Amino acid sequence: MCCDPPAADRLPPQVAAMHESYLALAAERPADWGGESDAYAAGQPYGRWLGVRLLAAVFSLQAGDWPATVRSCLTEPLPAGLVVASLDDGGLRLRAGPAPYVLEGGSVEVAVLLDSHLEQATRLEVDGTSVPVPAGGVELVTRAVTGAGPLPVGGADAPAAQPAARARLRLRAAAPSRWSVTDDRGGAWFPAGCLPRWDFHDRPLFHGNDLELEVPAVPLTVTCTRGMEFATAETTVTPSAGDSAEVELEPARLYETAARGWYGGDLHVHMNYSGDQVCGPDDAARMQLGEGLHLMTLVAGNIGRTRVYDREAFEATAGHDLAWTTGERVARFSVEFRNDLLGHFHGLGLTGRPARYHSGHDGSDEPHDWPPNADACREFRRLGATVGYTHPVFSPLSDGTPAQAFAVPRSVEARELVADAALGLVDSVDLIGPSDVEGTAVLYHHLLSCGLRLAATAGTDVWLSYSRGPLFSNPPGWGRVYADLRGTPLSVAAFADAVRAGRTQATNGPFLELLVDGRGPGDRIEATPGRRLPVTVGCQGLGVERLELVGPDGVLAATDAGGGAAPAIDAEVEAGESMWLCAVARGPGHPSVLGPVVFAHTSPVWVELHGRPLRRPASARWLLDWLDRFEAMLGQHGRFADDGQRAEVVGVIEQARRRYREFC
């Protein structure tokens, strides 16, 4: 049935004990198991009702204006089951979303959001309980209701629930898939034992095949997909009371990469990362299968204290494939090394326990911004892993300088990436993930233009233990790095070799094909000055509006999609000097893409003239500006035990400066 609970008896003892401890922590402190993230703890219950508005709410909470942000999210239509009770000098006003369905003999959760515009604290009675509300503040109250009776709120009656007869629904596809079942009031329905989760577009989702679930005997919408290589199949069904209805769907394939030797992976997935539910290995396996994801790296990582989530699972399995690995898919545990000032990076193929899992978190066992990330990069390399910096920047870097990447000190942006890449310690940069794709591309292009051979990769940073994110509760693999294995069977080692060689592309939907004189990403072409190189770029997938061929001097060729045909470029590029060439696809938001925009970017094909190195002085100066700002930020915000520690990190920056100055 694909929705059995995690089989603890098949887990290594330390992993089973870890899972049990997380269940206890989640019961004791939902959404913030370690007592280390007030923003997530406060925001998570609201996100259950505000859906995709959660991200804005969390950012506003960090800015200290939580009530105003919550109010900005209360636009019509309100979701089913949410009642907003507004208090001001004129009294109490209620407005509500549709009453949710409640199955006969069951219960359903509803919420009352108390929104006070009074200048003094007050109390309001909700379903017989007096609830304190701060002056000018908001308070969320939830209740489990069993019937249609009204919900008393401050002497008024709010709608509670609509009773509905029980029915059963059976779901089948040709393979494990991602499903969604919603009723005509927007309510979501899940099989017992499956973790309830919602994607970026606030659509409920679960994974499996041949599934059964209890549903109301009302009109239902069912969708089925299998990750970005597939379209979405949809149907409606109205099961009869007491009966069982069967739905069989098969999503159409948009493109197939494995047949061409390209395999898709997600290098940055958190199985457990605090949250409102606990994810077990079986849950993670179902998600990988249902997304058609060839490779998945589950990373252990801390948040802000000493606890490293999923550390026991990593240490019990380090260097070994997980139990559900086959010839068509592979999964491993690894580590995300985290310093919020210097940056975060992940390692694909890590074979052993590193000396440190994190640094620079005040209140943890590693409070100082030392040693430099460069030391951890070297250790990951010694332990067999690739090094990939993740979520590099959160702004578009649109002003021509790197200033926006230094606006917030501990923003988890990849400040040390520029130094570590110059020292040859980095293999890849995540162009897809919870970061700004345009700003990341700006940074990536400057690095390439200094001859740094970095692969384009993807690490989504999804948290499987969160029901709503919105990006963080997306399914794993919503963004992927596709690696050209050149006929080698799928394995972690083969995938890592492709990353090191730059035979990759990063995407959240479209699949790109780039050939320069018959050579693909990662390849090197020896050319003579003036030679004209034929270039073809193809693109498959949904939502692309513009296709570009780019190099160190900008856009070399472009086409806009139109007329229903797949966009393509057929051009010639003159080899005037050594260069890199990449293909890029862009588009606005699209229902099939689980992010704000459509984006794909290949790693480069390298064109070398008589072995001369690639040099673009303007990019070197831009990266030197980055390093200057990084050093200034260390001086102002770095935490060090002594001047020697600070000098060691600054020494890494100075080594990188010498490299970039060679190009000016």
Q: Which residue ranges define each predicted feature?
A:
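Catalytic cores of extracellular degradative/oxidative enzymes
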Residues: 262-456, 460, 465-468, 491
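Glycine-centered loop/turn motifs
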Residues: 105, 242, 333-335, 365, ...
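A short tyrosine-centered beta-strand micro-motif
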Residues: 218-222
